[in-house]
Amino acid sequence: MTFAAAQATYVLHSRPYKETSALVDFFTAQGRLRAVLRGARGKAGALARPFVPLEAEWRGRGELKTVARLESAGIPNLLSGQALFSGLYLNELLIRLLPAEDPQPEIFAHYAATLPLLAAGRPLEPLLRAFEWRLLEQLGYGFALDVDIHGRPIEPQALYQLLPEAGLEPVTQLQPGLFQGVELLSMADADWSAPGALAAAKRLMRQALAPHLGGRPLVSRELFMNRKESPRD
């Protein structure tokens, strides 16, 4: 049985396992991994919550490891309301899209930097779009926003459709799901002050992510929509 050196980590998801243990999905710079946390009803279980900076060691050679040590490594990021659902959304994307134990230091660093901004109440949409874009790029699914699939510069007044495996294709006929060139150029510059840029970026990221999510809806997105539709007291 091997022991992994201590690593900075975050809990993505945890669920009960057997009588007193938990099955936990962790995210580290060395990738996503799953481990059994024994004594989950004690101190370790109280630590194993999403958005808390942790330091952990694991043992085991197979895909399912065992937590050997788990300690706090910083101030918890306390998320509530829409920020909480946004954090859960990021966690679900990582669970669904990251291969197990595939090192992703850039994504980990971006995730660790995003959580405090969510906790601080920063505008959510730019943070989510930036994270989605970084995730797509690092996993090899990115595409250019300033040139089309033929290598021609994006024209502000032209219309484009996204071909997820290729990039942006110019079109001449109106159809659902198109993007204006001016919107794409605003996204390329991360200029969220441009009219319609954030809404277009949300549509674009949803189209870009869909083929890689396997057709299954995101639970966090459904929870958020249900919360918005629930009548308030």
UniProtKB/Swiss-Prot annotation:
User: Known InterPro entries for this protein?
Assistant: ARFGAP/RecO (IPR037278), DNA_rep/recomb_RecO_N (IPR022572), NA-bd_OB-fold (IPR012340), RecO (IPR003717), RecO_C (IPR042242)
Asked if DNA damage is a keyword of the record, the answer is yes
Source organism, top-level taxon: Bacteria
User: Pfam families given for it?
Assistant: RecO_C (PF02565), RecO_N (PF11967)
A Gene Ontology biological process annotation? double-strand break repair
PANTHER family given for it?
A: DNA REPAIR PROTEIN RECO (PTHR33991:SF1)
Question: Of which family is this protein a member?
Answer: Belongs to the RecO family.
NCBIfam families cross-referenced by the UniProt entry: reco
- Name of this chain's protein: DNA repair protein RecO
Highest classification ranks of the organism: Bacteria, Pseudomonadati, Pseudomonadota, Gammaproteobacteria, Pseudomonadales
Protein's gene: recO
